[in-house]
Regions:
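Accessory interaction regions appended to the cores of large information-processing enzymes
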Residues: 1-207
């Protein structure tokens, strides 16, 4: 019976995962040469690239190339970009998605026989990894705006609690019936279970 099936299911409750991101804070100039020789054709891909903040934290990356004189043939540009594209899925710091990176391929070299798309993609991935670590990387934590309405007598306790939760109080506005609205920015990770805590701290009178 259906009821028997339900009885055998284990239910695991866990906090939702917070969407952390990784980004960089300064410019980094790197060179990476991917070279392998093992009988027959080898592998060769050589890139010189800069990585810097793009200023757009809603977009993983922006890719540009300014190669002159055919140092890296045009047909390898997509492979270099693919290397960047694959790199931003899991960042070098803690495997969180990467945002806000501008990658520019400006030079490099190739081998008429040994170069391949795979070699240039690998070179770009290694260049990304090396540059990211040098470019003052940081983990971004989502911040949300919070509005709490509590009886005036509880404002001190609530503000102390918000500070403990790494919140930044932006303002306090008196409302009707002896209550105060506290407006704050607070890390999303600190908000799980907050409404329950708020009710217990205010005897059910905070919202």
């Amino acid at each position: 019976a259906a009821s028997d099936v339900y009885k055998r299911q284990d239910v695991v409750l866990s906090e939702p995962k917070v969407p952390f991101k990784e980004t960089i804070r300064k410019k980094s100039d790197v060179e990476y040469k991917y070279k392998k020789q093992s009988g027959g054709h080898g592998q060769y891909g050589h890139v010189k690239m800069t990585f810097e903040p793009s200023g757009d934290l809603d977009t993983p990356y922006v890719f540009e190339q300014v190669v002159v004189g055919g140092a890296v043939p045009k047909n390898y540009f997509p492979a270099v970009e693919k290397g960047v594209q694959e790199s931003v899925v899991k960042g070098p710091l803690a495997a969180y998605p990467v945002v806000g990176v501008k990658a520019v391929l400006y030079d490099g070299s190739y081998h008429p026989v040994d170069s391949s798309e795979m070699a240039f993609k690998t070179a770009a991935r290694q260049a990304f990894k090396s540059a990211f670590i040098q470019a003052n990387p940081v983990i971004l934590e989502p911040i949300v705006s919070l509005s709490v309405v509590v009886p005036d007598s509880y404002t001190g306790d609530i503000m102390g609690d918000l500070n403990k939760k790494r919140g930044r109080v932006l303002g306090m506005n008196p409302t009707d019936h002896g209550k105060t609205e506290i407006v704050a920015d607070i890390p999303l990770s600190e908000l799980y279970g907050y409404s329950t805590n708020l009710r217990s701290m205010t005897g059910g009178r905070g919202s």
